[in-house]
Amino acid sequence: MYIRTFGCQMNEYDSDKMADVLRADQGLELTDNPEDADVILFNTCSVREKAQEKVFSDLGRVQHLKKQNPNLVIGVGGCVASQEGEAIVKRAPYVDVVFGPQTLHRLPDLIKRRRAQGVSQVDISFPEIEKFDALPPPRVDGATAFVSIMEGCSKYCSFCVVPYTRGEEVSRPFDDVLLEVADLADQGVKEVTLLGQNVNAYRGAMGDSGEIADFAMLLEYVHEIPGIERIRYTTSHPKEMTQRMVDAYARLPKLVSFLHLPVQAGSDRVLAAMKRGYTALEFKSVVRRLRAARPSLTLSSDFIVGFPGETEEDFQKTMKLIEDVGFDTSFSFVYSRRPGTPAADLHDDTPQDVKLRRLQQLQALINQQAAAIAQGMIGTRQRVLVEGPSRRDPNELMGRTENNRIVNFPGVPRLIGHMVDVVVTHAHTNSLRGRVAGIERDTSGAE
């Protein structure tokens, strides 16, 4: 099987699960070459503009393979599939299966029905937690893994399609998450990333007791699982950053000193139009409390530039927020209209060249801040999880620091999958360079 993934880490996780269900049910293994595949899947993302056209363009590139091999199964999953549904088959009749993020576990049955009936199968329903109940146990090869703890979003920001493509927020049961993390730890995973559209909105049922665990409680329990040495999570929402969450940074050393906290804008007027549910001052208050609990915390964020009605004054307020807070990295884009969202109907009279100029200025400021953080790391001793050979030089190793910086350094292959101390010697634009200072034991549970 060949799977091409677009978009966020949730989609990466979903693609892994597609591979798991097809491997377990049909014995298929992954290939990097679509020409060698019996099943070709596109796991799509609808966040950016023209996502649908991108899907049909990619489908067109594999259509000839269907002509060569009529038994080939071509499928479209993800958020574009949820949005378009039957329209995908109408426009591209050679597509065999269309499925949403919540129905990927039904993929084997959809393929079987397609082969038995000779008719394209479409299932973009929202069966809530059924997806997780039907997935096979995770299989990983490496020291890091993703674990999805919830699906969907109930915030309904005016610009966002996620509530319409992934449904309302649904949390996995508390024990199910812990069992999956423990299973991954038994397979050698040392760093786990907990995933959700609004991951800190997690509210998981605790067995049959009727009690509900919040995200802070989940973090506390994951923290105690033997073998897990690092905990990350994404994506969080500022409204859900409770005091219990803030306190977790003071109590849980395995929780990394890095947080992705999307703010989107620094103007209260724009934030209100986006329906984000907080002000710039409230966002800065959250950051201040987080850094009081964990002074070493670095932040990344999301920014939308050129939202309908954004004035130059609004934009300058965003720039001021960036200057006040300081960010390590950002995902920043010019606003793109998403059909079916409330913002799609807002009047937008800002010229495109103005939007692009603002985006360039914003990215330049954050790049400047990121460079300063990188320079400040030179000479410091960083705890690094070694992930594998360096992409630049296969004779060297690559790992990540707590603040998610890639570090390349000389080392022997036996270090892969282990924590090592690395002294940073150089800072480059997108990575660091260092040398090994010492090897930590696997049994270390402290940061």
Swiss-Prot record:
Residues 1-116 form the MTTase N-terminal domain. NCBIfam families: miaB-methiolase, MiaB/RimO family radical SAM methylthiotransferase. It is found in: Cytoplasm. Its EC number is 2.8.4.3. Binds 2 [4Fe-4S] clusters. One cluster is coordinated with 3 cysteines and an exchangeable S-adenosyl-L-methionine. [4Fe-4S] cluster 1 binds at residues 8, 45, 79. Its cofactor is [4Fe-4S] cluster. GO terms for molecular function: 4 iron, 4 sulfur cluster binding; metal ion binding; N6-isopentenyladenosine methylthiotransferase activity. Residues 139-372 form the Radical SAM core domain. It is an enzyme of class 2 (transferase). This is tRNA-2-methylthio-N(6)-dimethylallyladenosine synthase. Belongs to the methylthiotransferase family. MiaB subfamily. GO terms for cellular component: cytosol. Catalyzes the methylthiolation of N6-(dimethylallyl)adenosine (i(6)A), leading to the formation of 2-methylthio-N6-(dimethylallyl)adenosine (ms(2)i(6)A) at position 37 in tRNAs that read codons beginning with uridine. Residues 375-438 form the TRAM domain. Its main location: cytoplasm. Monomer. It holds the Pfam family TRAM. It comes from Bordetella pertussis (strain Tohama I / ATCC BAA-589 / NCTC 13251). [4Fe-4S] cluster 2 binds at residues 153, 157, 160.
